[in-house]
Every structure is written in structure tokens, then in C-alpha cells.
Design a protein with these regions (language model features):
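Low-complexity, Ser/Thr/Pro-rich intrinsically disordered linker/stalk segments at domain junctions
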Residues: 2-8, 12, 19-140
């Protein structure tokens, strides 16, 4: 009975060890993404995940809130771009950070909104990437 219950634990430990080894060789174990996690008439929240690569690089992200105007996607007026947010060290498999915008929308009007996330890894493996969230409709 004891032997049967230890087998799944041994398999899990072997898989976990393989994941750590891959992260240390610089292979990305998870993907980077950005998404809207709050969408209503008074707030839009955006969140991003940055994939770690096992290095000592620092990961950070900033967001720019956009609305769909008649001429295409443009930044909202006011403070459209957030400050840089720390997502932690790339030593780990992934890091996340987010930003919440407070909205003031005219009553009776609905707007299509999205956020553009600028992802940054600094240090020995410096690089950047851009991800765009899905859209949401706020107001109405």
C-alpha cells in the first residue's frame, strides 16, 4: 500500500525537477500575456504575465489604456500610461503585475477599451515585448 502511494509523489518530484532545470538553461517555461481583469463604468484593470528565463534579469511592465475612436485605437486623455510596475525576477518561471485605471465616462455612452502592455526584461538578457489585451465595453 505504501509503495503505491509513493509512486505518484516520485513522478511529481521528477517532473518538478525537470522544470527547474529547463528554467536554469534559459528556456521559457510559460508564456507572456496581457488581459483585462476588471471592466466596468468606473474602472478598467489590466494584468500581464512575463515569462522568466532563469536569469537574474528584472521584469517590469507598464500599460497604456486605449479607446476605439472613429479613426482607430488611440490613448485615452489624461494619464493613459501607467508607471512601470515590477513583475519580479526572471529567475522564476513567471511574474505578474497589473494596473487599475479609474474611469470617468459620460452617462449613456459606451466605449470599447483595451490596454497595451509594454513588457521589459533588464539586465543580462535585456529585451522587450508588447502584448495587447482583449477589448471590453465600458459605460452604456
Amino acid at each position: 500500500m505504501l509503495r503505491r502511494s509513493l509512486l505518484p509523489i516520485a513522478i511529481c518530484a521528477a517532473v518538478a525537477g525537470a522544470g527547474v532545470a529547463s528554467a536554469q538553461t534559459g528556456e521559457s517555461l510559460s508564456s507572456s500575456w496581457a488581459q483585462v481583469n476588471i471592466c466596468n463604468a468606473s474602472q478598467l484593470g489590466a494584468r500581464a504575465q512575463l515569462a522568466g528565463d532563469g536569469s537574474s534579469s528584472q521584469m517590469s511592465v507598464r500599460f497604456t489604456l486605449q479607446w476605439l475612436s472613429p479613426s482607430g485605437w488611440v490613448p485615452v486623455t489624461g494619464a493613459a500610461t501607467s508607471p512601470w510596475q515590477s513583475a519580479g525576477s526572471a529567475e522564476y518561471t513567471w511574474g505578474q503585475a497589473g494596473w487599475t485605471y479609474n474611469l470617468t465616462l459620460p452617462p449613456g455612452h459606451a466605449y470599447q477599451l483595451r490596454a497595451v502592455a509594454e513588457l521589459s526584461w533588464s539586465g543580462e538578457n535585456a529585451r522587450t515585448a508588447t502584448h495587447t489585451t482583449g477589448t471590453c465595453t465600458a459605460g452604456g
